[in-house]
Amino acid sequence: MEVNILAFIATALFILVPTAFLLIIYVKTVSQNN
């Protein structure tokens, strides 16, 4: 099974970008509550 580096990067970005965005919102919300 060959690993397509471009597909791997695209998948990583597709997962990491929304996750990072949600984490930033979560951190801001917690900071405001405190």
From Swiss-Prot:
Q: Which GO terms describe its biological process?
A: photosynthesis, light reaction
- What is any one of the record's Gene Ontology cellular component terms? photosystem II
Its membrane topology is listed as: Single-pass membrane protein
State one Pfam family annotation.
PsbM
Membrane-spanning segments: 5-25
Presence of the UniProt keyword Cell membrane in the record:
no
Instruction: Give the keywords, sorted.
Output: Chloroplast, Membrane, Photosynthesis, Photosystem II, Plastid, Reaction center, Thylakoid, Transmembrane, Transmembrane helix
Q: Where in the cell is it found?
A: Plastid, Chloroplast thylakoid membrane
Does this entry carry the keyword Iron? no
Q: Which family does it belong to?
A: Belongs to the PsbM family.
Function per UniProt: One of the components of the core complex of photosystem II (PSII). PSII is a light-driven water:plastoquinone oxidoreductase that uses light energy to abstract electrons from H(2)O, generating O(2) and a proton gradient subsequently used for ATP formation. It consists of a core antenna complex that captures photons, and an electron transfer chain that converts photonic excitation into a charge separation. This subunit is found at the monomer-monomer interface.
Entry's PANTHER family?
Answer: PHOTOSYSTEM II REACTION CENTER PROTEIN M
Note the subunit structure. Answer: PSII is composed of 1 copy each of membrane proteins PsbA, PsbB, PsbC, PsbD, PsbE, PsbF, PsbH, PsbI, PsbJ, PsbK, PsbL, PsbM, PsbT, PsbX, PsbY, PsbZ, Psb30/Ycf12, at least 3 peripheral proteins of the oxygen-evolving complex and a large number of cofactors. It forms dimeric complexes.
Q: What is this protein called?
A: Photosystem II reaction center protein M
This chain's source organism reads Coffea arabica
